[in-house]
Amino acid sequence: MAAVTLSPCSMCCGSRRLRSVIVIQAQRGNWNRIRLSNFFFSKVWNISYRSKHKYSDNLLEQVEKYASARLENQSKLITKVAALMECDNVDDFIDKKSDEQVKKDLVLACKRFPSIILGDSRPVELYSNSKSYGESSSILKTPTDNSFLPTPMHGGWFDPDNLSRTLSSFCPELLQNDDSSDPREDILDDGSSFTSKTATSEVEATSDDVFAAQRFLATSIDSMPGLSKRHSNQLDSCGFHTMKKLLHHFPRTYADLQNAQVDIEDGQYLIFVGKVLSSKGVRASSSFSFLEVIVSCEVSGRDRTPEDLSHNAEDKAGKSIFLHLKKFFRGTRFTWQPFLNSIQEKHKVGDLVCISGKVKSLRAEDHFEMREYNIDVLKDEEESSHRAQGRPYPIYPSKGGLNPKFLSDVISRALRVLPANMDPIPKEITKVFGLPSLNDAYVGIHEPKTLDEADLARKRLIFDEFFYLQLARLYQMLQSLGTKIEKDVLLEKFRKPVLNSVYIEEWSTLTKSFLKALPYSLTPSQLSAVSEIIWDLKRPVPMNRLLQGDVGCGKTVVAFLACMEVIGSGYQAAFMAPTELLAIQHYEQCRDLLENMEGVSSKPTIGLLTGSTPAKQSRMIRQDLQSGAISFIIGTHSLIAEKIEYSALRIAVVDEQQRFGVIQRGKFNSKLYGTSMISKSGSSDSDDTSKADLSMAPHVLAMSATPIPRSLALALYGDISLTQITGMPLGRIPVETHIFEGNETGIKEVYSMMLEDLKSGGRVYVVYPVIDQSEQLPQLRAASAELEIVTKKFPKYNCGLLHGRMKSDDKEEALNKFRSGETQILLSTQVIEIGVDVPDASMMVVMNAERFGIAQLHQLRGRVGRGTRKSKCLLVGSSTNSLKRLNMLGKSSDGFYLANIDLLLRGPGDLLGKKQSGHLPEFPVARLEIDGNMLQEAHIAALNVLGDSHDLEKFPALKAELSMRQPLCLLGD
């Protein structure tokens, strides 16, 4: 410790800042002095323990007394500790400790999160296992720690002399030579090959510019020129952390500063621009007040003749109208004069404003009232330029209390410094689909010259959202394949779906035997569906497929054949139905077909597991599933219970998947099989099972007559493959749909049609929304309450009752009586909606039909028309307003058409979450129900890009953007 010397400067605390710190600490009280004393004590104690020097021991004693020492002694002591730590003063000591902590944090972060980017380096790709920087033997030497350098991205080195072209960075741009790849034959469609036409040097230069632009979008908002610290903090606190976040705050609408060019009618939603004539807060009573703002606007009068316009120059400019904007307040606190003064001062006389809302005409000519409106103040200079050029004016939504005008100004500044070449998507792709560049899209949506330009910019941003989702999905599928040939074949099958099938001769022996046991022949559409599913089952990746077809088209037997294909290969199959009645029906149907099979030495073992299965029998079934004794299990939610363990589950079929929640449908994915099972049903078509098969999640086949919007959205986006059965079995007679209002006249006509059908030997379902009468909803008809009424109305016919509260035996008995003809009228709830098969049922009556969804009504209609009789479906609405929605079902019996209607009404749901309705939060611009036609274009573009470069190495900027937009954790397993 003899080397430790305290200079006079250090003994004087080194700087004024040190003394001020001590003074502040002293002023804050004894608690802070104790904290500082403990901090110094720990530092000096470590040195004293290591050195055993008398000086450090004496200093340790002084530190113990720091909290009670005088101010000047505290100052001297701090300087001694700083010198002991080999620092000039306390400032130097604090800076060193801060640097050590930052370095420690960086090392830890880079070790745990290798995708973290330091400085302005090139983004690290998330889709490949890139080697660390330290493993490269020919790296440009820099004084920077190698552990913080980025990973090489693509071929070709940058010349160090040219690095000054890029933004200032933490380390040089790194690229890697890779001349081992040979040119390959292009399998893309005509016009889809584009990289072969571009020189390598040009691609590298373009990629460099794009990377610089991507770094610009990722820069912090406080780096924007001319933005004050206060404004940058406001933007950051409202979520605008980066330039990209700011540019993605899009206008909610555009104002046409030329105003309306049409006649104004009551109820129209219009946008006007005008000047405030008056703003007045009025106290109408002791507890009621309102604000009235009068705005003068100019519109062109279409009601005037051309002759009038030619004689009057003033008329050519249009006529003036007056908008009375009114907002009402109730409560005594809203009648105080200070409040009234404050609200009327928000809109000053002479302000230029943009108003949007619903108009209502007043008695005075050219005077209109608006009670629901949005009002935005415009700037005179902006208004004059926009009006002179006829440009639309963007109206931004406020966020976090920020003024829309302020947001508009900041966005305009960002557009001025936006790089010209910033598009990661190849120009050939945007050119083929007639889309603008990314720079033009940002400018076009924020500062459009015309509404058409704004619409084109919106299409480009929508295309980006769809394209990256499609590209991520296809890229992930390609990475699961090994060879280039396999990847080419997969892409070709996506281009030509007709190839996605196998011939019947390639089916397993068990599947072909089951097909022969059917008492009827499959339709061509059914055979095509089976071949397509079996093709998917033979692939080395888990299947995720939706089987869609109208009610009664034969989806169940197609699923049975898919299960036989899996069982014939030595694995297990699970079939989950939403109701116990349907599970029993499927079990009995499959059992009978297996008994009729011929030419099979050992038939598959089938089991039934529902909530009503006795405990002892349920335990035996679980043991047989775990051991592999049961090859095919049919049941309800019991199949996904935690107690259930499968020996070798290979396929999970979810029947009527719209009845299950997102979590329930996903639980099958957790039922991984760990070992191969030797089939108890016969010889396996394959003797060996690959190790990859032993850890792969089971295939999932979902079936639905009307897909819920979320499933339809996933199918359109490509995360679910779609198989559609378009044909119907021969002899199937279409069901007539009739709509009635639930008044006395309508009910009388319904009963008349029921009696006519019963006299001809038919059987009638009558479905109600509730079981018992409800006091909260007295207008709803109840099944149990209506039983007595219907029985008296049809005394010559027997009536039965079926609902969900009944015991399983009672429900089965009621259904069997109706099936056998013992009862001719069955009053029920929606428990019969799914899968109940009574061929002689010829009429379906749905009371209070507006209480059911479109999918439910389509399913209920499918319970009739399964035999040779002509069938009818009668939908009874409670009011006239409900008939409009019900008429949609009367116009079509196509499940996909009705699913699109449901999609339009409800939205596609949370794509990556658990919500079943609403709009996609991941896509701020796209609306699937409106912009769904662009999905196919995005899919084609993704196929073209991956066809030209399977690993996206030819498009490094695109790959980096994909890594940021669609990380693996979002794509799922």
UniProtKB/Swiss-Prot annotation:
Entry EC number(s): 5.6.2.4
GO cellular component: chloroplast; mitochondrion
SUPFAM superfamilies noted in UniProt: Nucleic acid-binding proteins (SSF50249), P-loop containing nucleoside triphosphate hydrolases (SSF52540)
Origin: domain of life: Eukaryota
Domain named Helicase C-terminal: residues: 746-904
CDD domains in the cross-refs: DEXHc_RecG
GO molecular function annotations of the record: ATP binding; ATP hydrolysis activity; DNA binding; DNA helicase activity
Keywords from the UniProt entry: ATP-binding, Chloroplast, DNA damage, DNA recombination, DNA repair, DNA-binding, Helicase, Hydrolase, Isomerase, Mitochondrion, Nucleotide-binding, Plastid, Transit peptide
Region (Sufficient for chloroplastic and mitochondrial trgeting): 1-208
Catalytic activity: Couples ATP hydrolysis with the unwinding of duplex DNA by translocating in the 3'-5' direction; ATP + H2O = ADP + phosphate + H(+)
Pfam families: DEAD (PF00270), Helicase_C (PF00271), RecG_dom3_C (PF19833)
GO biological process: DNA recombination; DNA repair; mitochondrial genome maintenance
InterPro entries with a match to the protein in the record: ATP-dep_DNA_helicase_RecG (IPR004609), DEAD/DEAH_box_helicase_dom (IPR011545), Helicase_ATP-bd (IPR014001), Helicase_C-like (IPR001650), NA-bd_OB-fold (IPR012340), P-loop_NTPase (IPR027417), RecG/Mfd (IPR047112), RecG_dom3_C (IPR045562)
Binding site for ATP: 549-556
Chief location category: plastid
Subcellular location, record wording: Plastid, Chloroplast; Mitochondrion
Keyword Chaperone part of the UniProt annotation: no
Sequence motif: DEQQ box, positions: 655-658
Tissues/organs with expression: Expressed in most tissues, not seen in pollen, ovules or developing seeds.
Domain notes: The first 208 codons are able target to both the chloroplast and mitochondrion.
Function, as annotated: Plays a critical role in recombination and DNA repair. Helps process Holliday junction (HJ) intermediates to mature products by catalyzing branch migration. Has replication fork regression activity, unwinds stalled or blocked replication forks to make a HJ that can be resolved. Has a DNA unwinding activity characteristic of a DNA helicase with 3'-5' polarity.
Name of this protein: ATP-dependent DNA helicase homolog RECG1, chloroplastic/mitochondrial
Taxon lineage: Eukaryota, Viridiplantae, Streptophyta, Embryophyta, Tracheophyta
Gene responsible for this protein: RECG1
